[in-house]
Amino acid sequence: MSDKEAFTEHDWRRLLTSLGEDPNRPGLHETPARVAKAWKHWTSGYDQDPVSVLKAFEDGAEQYNELIVVRGIPVYSHCEHHLAPFFGKATVGYLPNGKIVGLSKLTRLVDIFSKRLQVQERMTMQIANALMEVLEPKAVGVVVKCRHMCMESRGIRTQGEETITSCMLGELQPNLALRTEFLALARD
């Protein structure tokens, strides 16, 4: 067990004790280890380089010059303000400029950034900026729609509200027709 896991497991044991629970009782005995493992998974994006997943193909398809859009990409993250989960779907698209990536790479990119403590607005921009930096496409668009448990389970306690963020780079900024096409493809 690494120092990071042991420290985290110890902290979860202390949290249970501070709540008045007995971390050694049957239902909680293994909870600190399980929670430590879960948080390691939920924050594994810090150990991954987004650039490494965006290797361009060289198979002839790089001549494709229309929008490539993947929608319905799962987002599971935790807000950096309360450590509360937020979850939803992302749509990622780009207009290639001689380089394309496998479609699953867009999903992996979203996964890397969502497995960090985040705010949705920054995560949306990070996804778009990474794609723009590595592929140098003519345009990038990212739309993220999530429910935030920090709003639903505490504070205002509203159920089912969704927050939608977007980031448009390159030709999607000035080109209204291209932006409209991307947003139409991004709709559920």
For each of these PLM feature ranges, what is it?
Residues 1-188:
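A domain-level signal for the structural core that forms small-molecule/cofactor-binding pockets
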